[in-house]
Amino acid sequence: MGYFDRLRALSADRNTLLCVGLDPDPERIPGGAAGALRHCREVVRQTEEHVCCYKPNSAFWEQYGPDGWHALLELRDEAPQTPFLFDGKRGDMGNTMRAYALTVFATLAMDAATVNPYLGADSIEEFTRYEDRGVYVVCRSSNPGAASLQHLDVKGRPLYMHVAELAQGLNTHQNVGLVVGATAPAEIAEVRRSSQLPFLIPGIGAQEGDLEGSVRAAWNGDPASCLMSASRSVLFADKPSREAAKLKDGINAVVGALR
């Protein structure tokens, strides 16, 4: 079963569209890589029933050196039934991307990954050739400076709309999605009008993205269409299980009103 089918099945089974980011901060979590593993392992144990995916950002594990990679692999084993989405936003020449894809999908055994489209379609194809893995192309990101590049006018349309079109053309194996941030619900709606690809929507927690507006803009009836992601707001909550349940219920309430 491919990544997106697994995501749909788990979403239905757990009644959730929530993804939780696992991004340890050494300034808030003592003990190096071992401390990060302990903290994130507890978060996984508390939240797994409320999520359909976990999203470790590679930089937060790379900062610990080799111990960080080992810790991430151990964390992956903590929740084998839940997909892990490797948020590395890799983007490079084809041969390099081939090595990145091998690292992410074979060595680390991740179920999905984010990629950067700046080098064009041929670089992304090194990831999409793994037919049973998901590949989310960064389209309209959630950071404040995104518009300076992603909103550039290209032949009468913003650049992010061209990225959405490029991603659609790469979806031969039905394993491609888009990253569109919850801080830009109007842009999510614009992309959704032209594309029915699955969306990964980060930014509903500490970044204070628009949860309701984003779900309304993205939802198309497909459970994979609207994977809502929060990281710090859950990871550093006094009780991660309660925060995850709150987010899950909030998302479900919006979806319920749309059905």
Where are these regions (language model features)?
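Acidic (Asp/Glu)-rich catalytic clusters
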Residues: 11-13, 44-50, 73-80, 126-131, ...
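Active-site-adjacent beta->alpha loops and helix N-cap segments on the catalytic face
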Residues: 63-78, 93-97, 117-132, 183-193, ...
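Conserved, mostly hydrophobic/aromatic
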Residues: 20, 54, 87, 113, ...
